Amino acid sequence: MNIGIKSVHTYCPEYFLDNFEQSKKWGVEKDFINNKIGSIKLSRMKECEDTTDIAQYAVENLFQSNDSLRSKIQCLIVVTQNPDNGGLPHSSAILHKKLELEKTCAVFDLSLGCSGYVQGLSIAKAFMESQGFKNGILVTADPYSKIIDANDRDTALLFGDAATATWLGENPLWSIKNCDFGIVSDKYEALQVSNSKLVMKGREVFNFAAFYVPKSIQKVLNDSGLKIEDIDMVLLHQGSRFIVETLARRLGTEGRTPFSSKNYGNTISSSIPMMLAELNLHTSRRILLSGFGVGLSWATCILEKIEK
């Protein structure tokens, strides 16, 4: 059994914050928004909505494209750090009810941030293969609008809300190959919640990513017997335009490492699957994914297209 990615579907709220407009209260120049942050708009779910609502919208988009899939789902995994009801019950249980999935479906949450999608792929693949499950869904939904301090320049200009649903199963489009994981836990305070609001030490997070992510990518390449030239696209967590472009220069992959969150912001664990869904990857044979952030943790893997 080879469980891999069959398709990826997304949901991005219709309401957005204008980053140029809100940045005026700090006297931030447009050039800083364009060239450093990179996101001119930040997506926001409605005040009446919660994490499982936007997660449901993403999964329903998947089901609309695959009519008979709902009754075949055997595993539902939700990656979030901002669950409904403070996390009890787990958001995957609430989402399971909203989606009306079978009672025999295994459901659980993963409390992971920016590295969550790649870690979730590895966990879901291993879990499904060990149990002989043929169809599962990995959901990412982490609306940071629930914890953003609107008066904190360091965080208010960065994050957007979105959700994704990745269908995992047999006969996939993308096979999940070598992975690498790690954490520098003595730096966890660089990105945490304090007094119910997100607090970030941006320089520490940047230094962490700039040092550890290239090493992780090189390890995965070495373990795979590949060189960076063998990778068609490098999809990095969309922390900001500055960190994505800095890493691309260090890796020598400027033309293959897109910044694509201009119109919705840093969507945490959803940023990488958003790219998988939106970018034209038809000519790509190998894609490298690397998520990094909260923990401070990283997770890197290679996807390889299955030739039909």
Segments and roles (model prediction):
Residues 51-66, 209-224, 272-275:
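Short, well-ordered amphipathic alpha-helical segments that serve as non-catalytic structural scaffolds
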Residues 26-33, 86-101, 135-144, 241-253:
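Acidic-glycine-rich active-site phosphate/pyrophosphate-binding loop
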Residues 129-160:
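Flexible, glycine-rich active-site loops centered on histidine and acidic residues
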